[in-house]
Design a protein with these regions (language model features):
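N-terminal auxiliary segments of SAM/dcSAM-dependent transferases
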Residues: 1-58
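Conserved Class I S-adenosyl-L-methionine
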Residues: 7-9, 233-304
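Class I SAM-dependent methyltransferase Rossmann-like catalytic core
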Residues: 57-84, 88
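Class I SAM-dependent methyltransferase SAM/SAH-binding core
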Residues: 100-103, 108-156
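A short acidic, Gly/Pro-enriched loop at the edge of an enzyme's catalytic core
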Residues: 154-166
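Helix-to-beta-strand junctions that scaffold the AdoMet/dcAdoMet cofactor pocket
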Residues: 183-184
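Conserved beta-strand signature within the Rossmann-like core of class I S-adenosyl-L-methionine
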Residues: 187-194, 198
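Short alpha-helix
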Residues: 212-226, 253-262
């Protein structure tokens, strides 16, 4: 019988909700299977598409969008945001030997990789990356100690109850009910959204979409009553981008679904000048309510009275 791994305690069959076990062959992910006999084979790039046969009503980020995002992020333009997230995760996981991390809406896995690398060398983390884009999961599957799953965040997550210590939710849908289910009591969720002024200077020239002014309040509402907002941090990054980098910035986000790539590339090339913008983000740190601890405190107060 195959030895159980930490990941076997985090995954759940999307068909019957029994636990999923990961089978590796020659060190690479090969199959996911449950006791009821449901089986999912890994794609040759190492990710698993659990939406097979179900599909989704949402549009995945395409190959060009994902390639633009990978190139832009790997160039280090948003490194300050990754460092801020790494610092927070390192702080909340201090003393954990085998923490479990979920990146819900992981994209290429850039932030997940940076966060895992920020943990002490004595830590042996396991991670799950979820995203609706199979093109993104091809890249996220390369993050060490990570299982990459194609999945729709608005559905019940293919994950076990209370399986994760930390959850990352970066520029992605906030399924607060499911986030609360899969986080352990007292676990931490880090939600990143753009500030209203994010990239405002380049909105016209780059064809970017507008940003709602009330995103912070919307996140709190979406996370629900099982989470308490414990900290907020704003990160601003001034950027000076040449035409190729500006093209990648425009194509990698939601506007990439609507832009004409060649028209944008030609417009930026003809202009020739650098694009000056400021990336602006808000990190909201939430703690999942630990009802057992609350009850214990109440009982302690009652007995002392």
């Amino acid at each position: 019988m195959q030895q159980q791994t930490p990941l076997d305690r985090t995954l759940r069959c999307p068909v019957c909700q029994l636990g999923l076990s990961l089978d590796r062959q020659q060190g690479s992910p090969a199959h996911l299977g449950c006791p009821a006999g449901h089986r999912f084979d890994a794609a040759k790039q190492g990710y698993f598409n659990l939406l097979s046969g179900k599909g989704t009503n949402f549009t995945q980020d395409g190959a060009q969008m994902v390639a633009a995002r990978a190139s832009f992020l790997d160039a280090g333009h948003y490194e300050s945001l990754a460092e801020a997230l790494g610092h927070r995760v390192r702080t909340v996981l201090r003393g954990y030997e085998h923490p479990s991390v979920l990146d819900a809406g992981a994209g290429t896995g850039y932030y997940l990789r940076q966060v895992l690398q920020a943990l002490p060398g004595t830590t042996a983390p396991s991670a799950v990356a979820l995203d609706i884009s199979r093109y993104a999961m091809r890249r996220a599957a390369k993050v060490p100690n990570t299982v990459a799953l194609v999945w729709d965040l608005w559905r019940d997550l293919p994950l076990q109850d209370g399986a994760f210590d930390v959850l990352l939710n970066i520029f992605s849908p906030h399924n607060g009910t499911e986030f609360a289910r899969v986080l352990r009591p007292g676990g931490t969720a880090l939600v990143v959204t753009p500030l209203p002024e994010h990239l405002a200077e380049g909105a016209g020239s780059l064809g970017l979409l507008g940003i709602a002014a009330d995103k912070a309040a919307g996140v709190v509402a979406a996370m629900g009553e099982e989470f308490i907002l414990t900290a907020t941090e704003e990160v601003r990054i001034p950027l000076v981008l040449d035409p190729p980098a500006a093209f990648e910035l425009a194509m990698m986000g939601p506007a990439g679904h609507h832009l004409n790539p060649e028209a944008l590339r030609n417009r930026l090339s003809d202009a020739g000048n650098a694009t000056l913008v400021t990336a602006a983000f808000r990190i909201q740190e939430f703690r999942k309510v630990d009802e057992n601890r609350i009850q214990a405190n109440l009982e302690g107060l009652s007995s002392s009275g």
